[in-house]
Curated annotation (Swiss-Prot):
This is DNA-directed RNA polymerase subunit omega. Belongs to the RNA polymerase subunit omega family. InterPro entries: DNA-dir_RNA_pol_omega, Pol_omega/Rpo6/RPB6, RPB6/omega-like_sf. One of its GO terms (biological process) is DNA-templated transcription. The gene is rpoZ. One of its GO terms (cellular component) is DNA-directed RNA polymerase complex. It comes from Actinobacillus pleuropneumoniae serotype 3 (strain JL03). Promotes RNA polymerase assembly. Latches the N- and C-terminal regions of the beta' subunit thereby facilitating its interaction with the beta and alpha subunits. The keyword Transcription applies. Its EC number is 2.7.7.6. It catalyses: RNA(n) + a ribonucleoside 5'-triphosphate = RNA(n+1) + diphosphate.
């Protein structure tokens, strides 16, 4: 099990409060298997993995925003494609 110091992770983010928000968002992604870990799991829980990623500078608030924006765009494109497909099927029926 890797040792994580919250102070080092907070230094990467800027303050404890933003650290908590960023780590929670990332841990939720890991827990729901939305994204793969960027560091070896080593039997750690998602919160510890998130803190390790932050500590190594692999994740921060801006990166999380970009990832979530990309996911939202992909979701919107998929929905539009599904609507278009259903409209074509209905028109040809």
């Amino acid at each position: 099990m890797a040792r994580v110091t919250v102070q080092e992770a907070a230094d990467k983010i800027g303050n404890r409060f933003d650290l908590i928000l960023t780590a929670a968002r990332r841990a939720r992604q890991l827990q729901l298997h939305v994204r793969e870990p960027l560091v070896p799991e080593e039997n750690d829980k998602p919160t510890v993995i998130a803190l390790r990623e932050i500590e190594k500078g692999l994740i921060n608030g801006q990166i999380m925003d970009q990832l979530e924006n990309n996911d939202a765009i992909q979701q919107e494109v998929a929905e539009q494609e599904a609507i278009s497909f259903l409209a074509d099927v209905q028109a040809n029926a």
